[in-house]
């Protein structure tokens, strides 16, 4: 049984609802989490994926608050992160409770594909990619992460999942209320917290828990929610969430926001967000998810609507200069579009901006035009290709995000594993060399190869070559 910090037990007992018991809390906290995944509908439908994986011995049990989320029961032990399907971005390994904040934010958000949305604390990217999927890669999703090392992880997951409506930033999120005041239609603040709800995933999560340590976290949470509210447009929605369980990191932070802007804050009830949501709903309409309620991690979710204008707290910052990208001219855009269509059968999205930097060609979200000069961005949109003396060289991430099920060579499982391990694929009766071709598995993109007639020359970027790739239906390593 998990060893819980006694100070934590004493503290949390005061916050536990009367209808729940500490014995049940400790019992569920001692159980391993049920594995759960979210299907990436930017690449494959949930129905297609369920059918596909059922044939491989997977049993997928729907998560009631996320239409694309499933608990997974497997016929044998499989390292999900090493499967072909995970590497090619067909699913994200995501704890079930963490799917709740995006679901709450997008509930009632019509035409979300046209919105500008902020994810204030994004890494490693589970909620960012979930929101991008809900937006169908449209609109603009600004994804911020304070930790430089975690920005890299965020970017890797955005790429793997084929997301291209994002602009990544690397700031202390307290600056958003100043730099991007009144800019966002909706905001998710999944705030840094004590992690009290993650004990089932990490038995040592509460080893150093203390009220003193939490006090500084709470001050940060209050500053972040103020910043988020200032960055939100009037009429917009803000979801505040944590994986903490205490009132001090949850309800009291929301009450702090109400005290700061009493005329502008309206709490929205989440009691009908999904069947049985009322089991975790507080009197304010927040969801306070304890592990024993849904057999999940602990989580807290509150939804706030901004019902009145709030004055800017600080002067408008100076515009950022020296933006390194320029809009591509019509000739370049036509040549790039022809290259993608003629070589790969891909039509570039018409609602994006084709931008260039030196000999790099990028696809930016159209709404990015409104943000240039307002803040420094780490990475925007999707890198399409590099320029050559004659023509272009496609980027792997462009194929992973834009390719469809046509104009490709379908690999079998053993060939797909070989490709992801950086090896060339021999061909029998390969015919004449065809140049650059898209490779697929399950008719979803794996990457690009050069068809040389008798073999497919592997063009997988070196940093993406894997030492270990496994079948989703067996533990056999090839």
Curated annotation (Swiss-Prot):
Q: What is its EC number?
A: 2.1.1.178
Please explain the role this protein plays, according to its UniProt record.
Specifically methylates the cytosine at position 1407 (m5C1407) of 16S rRNA.
Keyword rRNA processing among UniProt keywords: yes
Keywords annotated in UniProt: Cytoplasm, Methyltransferase, RNA-binding, rRNA processing, S-adenosyl-L-methionine, Transferase
Q: Which domain of life is it from?
A: Bacteria
Q: Which GO terms describe its cellular component?
A: cytoplasm
Q: Which family does it belong to?
A: Belongs to the class I-like SAM-binding methyltransferase superfamily. RsmB/NOP family.
The places in or outside the cell where this protein is found are:
Cytoplasm
Which reaction is recorded as catalysed by this protein? cytidine(1407) in 16S rRNA + S-adenosyl-L-methionine = 5-methylcytidine(1407) in 16S rRNA + S-adenosyl-L-homocysteine + H(+)
Which GO biological-process labels does this protein carry?
rRNA base methylation
Q: Which molecular function term from Gene Ontology is one that the record holds?
A: rRNA (cytosine-C5-)-methyltransferase activity
Starting at the broadest rank, the lineage of the source organism is:
Bacteria, Pseudomonadati, Pseudomonadota, Gammaproteobacteria, Alteromonadales
Q: Where, by residue number, does S-adenosyl-L-methionine bind?
A: 121-127, 145, 172, 190
Give the organism, scientific name.
Shewanella woodyi (strain ATCC 51908 / MS32)
What is the protein name for this chain? Ribosomal RNA small subunit methyltransferase F
Which is an annotated Pfam family here? Answer: Methyltr_RsmB-F
Q: SUPFAM superfamilies from the xrefs?
A: S-adenosyl-L-methionine-dependent methyltransferases
Q: Keyword Iron-sulfur: yes or no?
A: no
Residues forming the catalytic site = 243
């Amino acid at each position: 049984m998990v060893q819980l910090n006694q100070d934590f037990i004493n503290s949390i007992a005061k916050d536990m609802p009367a209808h729940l018991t500490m014995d049940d809390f400790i019992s569920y906290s001692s159980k391993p989490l049920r594995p759960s995944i979210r299907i990436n509908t930017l690449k494959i439908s949930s129905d297609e994926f369920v059918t596909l994986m059922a044939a491989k011995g997977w049993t997928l049990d729907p998560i009631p608050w996320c239409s694309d989320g499933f608990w997974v029961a497997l016929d044998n032990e499989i390292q999900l992160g090493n499967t072909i399907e995970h590497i090619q971005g067909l699913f994200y390994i995501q704890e079930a409770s963490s799917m709740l904040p995006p679901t709450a934010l997008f509930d009632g958000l019509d035409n979300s594909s046209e919105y500008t949305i902020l994810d204030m604390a994004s890494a490693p990217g589970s909620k960012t990619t979930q929101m991008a999927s809900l937006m169908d890669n449209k609109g603009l999703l600004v994804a911020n992460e304070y930790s430089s090392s975690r920005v890299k992880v965020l970017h890797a997951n955005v790429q793997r999942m084929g997301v291209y409506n994002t602009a990544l930033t690397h700031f202390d999120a307290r600056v958003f209320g100043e730099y991007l005041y009144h800019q966002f239609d909706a905001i998710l603040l999944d705030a840094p917290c004590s992690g009290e709800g993650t004990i089932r995933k990490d038995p040592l999560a509460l080893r150093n828990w203390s009220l003193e340590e939490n006090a500084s976290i709470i001050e940060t949470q209050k500053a972040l929610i103020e910043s988020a509210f200032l960055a939100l447009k009037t009429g917009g929605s803000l979801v505040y969430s944590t994986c903490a369980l205490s009132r001090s990191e949850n309800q009291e932070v929301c009450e702090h926001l109400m005290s700061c802007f009493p005329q502008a804050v309206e709490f929205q009830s989440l009691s009908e967000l999904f069947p049985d949501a009322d089991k975790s709903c507080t009197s304010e309409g927040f969801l306070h998810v304890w592990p024993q309620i849904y057999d999940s991690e602990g989580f807290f979710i509150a939804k706030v609507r901004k019902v009145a204008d709030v004055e800017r707290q600080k002067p408008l910052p100076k515009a950022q200069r020296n933006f390194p990208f320029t809009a591509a001219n019509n000739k370049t855009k036509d040549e790039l579009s022809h290259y993608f269509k003629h070589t790969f059968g891909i039509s570039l999205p018409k609602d994006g901006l084709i931008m260039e930097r030196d000999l790099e060609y990028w696809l930016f979200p159209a709404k990015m035009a409104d943000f240039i000069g307002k803040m420094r961005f780490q990475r925007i949109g999707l890198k399409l290709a590099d320029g050559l003396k004659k023509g272009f060289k496609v980027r792997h991430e462009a194929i992973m995000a834009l390719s469809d099920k046509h104009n490709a060579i379908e690999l079998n499982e053993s060939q797909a594993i070989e490709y992801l391990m950086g090896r060339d694929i021999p061909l029998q009766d390969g015919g004449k060399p065809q140049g650059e071709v898209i490779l697929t598995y399950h008719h979803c993109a794996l990457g690009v190869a050069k068809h040389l007639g008798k073999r497919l020359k592997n063009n997988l970027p070196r940093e993406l070559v894997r030492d270990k790739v496994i079948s989703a239906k067996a533990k056999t390593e090839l």
